[in-house]
C-alpha cells in the first residue's frame, strides 16, 4: 500500500496537548517515509515505557484512515487495549475518526455489532486483544496493523492479523530491547 502524506495529519499533531519530542518526530517521519514508499512497511519502534511510542502509533493509524484505509491495534491485555482505546478516542474523535474496541469481555451482541461495523468500514480503527485475529473479524480495507508489546504475541499471531488486509503496513512496538 502506498500512502500519501496528508495535511490533516499536521492538524492532528497541532491539536495534541504537548509537542512531539525530537525522538518522536524522527520516529514518526521515518515511519511515514516507509508508508509513502512503494514497499510494504515492516517496522519496529522500540523505546522505554513512557517514551511516547503510542503517540507515534496513533498518528500512523490516523494517516491510514486519512488515506481511506482502516487500522488495527492489537494489545496483549484487555486493560492495555482499553487504555489505547481511550487514548485514541480522546486524540482522534475531534477529527471524525471512528474507533471501536474488540475484547473478550464484550457481550455477544456487542461483538456482533463491532464485527458488522468493521466489515462495512463504519469503523476506521479497531483496537483489541487476540480477539482481532479470530476468523470472524473481517476488515473492509485494512491498511496498517500495529502490535503493541510484540514480544507477548507469537509470530503466527502477528502474521494472522496482517492477513486480514491486502499486504497492510506493519508497525510493532516494544519496550523490551531486542537482542542482536
PLM feature spans:
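Conserved RecA-like ASCE P-loop NTPase motor core of nucleic-acid helicases/translocases
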Residues: 70-77, 102
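Loop/turn-to-beta-strand initiation segments
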Residues: 68-72, 98, 121-125, 141-144, ...
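Pre-Walker A segment
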Residues: 1-51, 55-72
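Conserved motor-coupling elements within RecA-like helicase/translocase cores
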Residues: 105-126, 133-142
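Conserved helix-turn-beta segment of the N-terminal RecA-like "Helicase ATP-binding" lobe
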Residues: 80-117
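Conserved hydrophobic/aromatic pocket- or pore-lining residues that grip, position, or stack substrates
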Residues: 24, 49, 77, 127, ...
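Post-DEXD/H (motif II) to motif III coupling segment of the RecA-like Helicase ATP-binding lobe
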Residues: 82-85, 139-180
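Hydrophobic residues in beta-strands of the RecA-like P-loop NTPase core, especially within AAA+ ATPase
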Residues: 46, 128, 146-147
Amino acid at each position: 500500500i502506498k500512502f500519501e502524506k496528508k495535511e490533516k495529519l499536521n492538524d492532528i499533531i497541532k491539536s495534541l496537548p504537548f509537542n512531539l519530542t525530537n525522538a518522536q518526530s524522527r520516529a514518526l517521519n521515518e515511519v511515514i517515509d516507509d508508508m509513502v514508499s512503494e514497499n510494504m512497511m515492516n517496522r519496529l519502534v522500540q523505546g522505554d515505557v513512557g517514551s511516547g511510542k503510542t503517540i507515534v502509533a496513533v498518528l500512523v493509524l490516523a494517516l491510514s484512515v486519512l488515506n481511506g484505509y482502516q487500522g488495527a491495534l492489537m494489545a496483549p491485555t484487555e486493560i492495555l487495549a482499553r487504555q489505547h482505546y481511550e487514548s485514541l478516542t480522546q486524540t482522534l474523535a475531534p477529527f471524525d475518526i471512528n474507533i471501536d474496541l474488540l475484547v473478550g469481555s464484550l457481550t455477544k451482541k456487542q461483538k456482533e455489532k463491532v464485527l458488522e461495523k468493521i466489515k462495512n468500514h463504519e469503523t476506521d480503527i479497531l483496537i483489541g486483544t487476540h480477539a482481532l485475529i479470530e476468523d470472524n473479524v473481517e476488515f473492509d480495507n485494512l491498511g496498517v496493523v500495529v502490535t503493541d508489546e510484540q514480544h507477548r504475541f507469537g509470530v503466527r499471531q502477528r502474521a494472522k492479523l496482517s492477513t486480514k488486509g491486502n499486504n497492510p503496513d506493519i508497525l510493532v512496538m516494544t519496550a523490551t530491547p531486542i537482542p542482536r
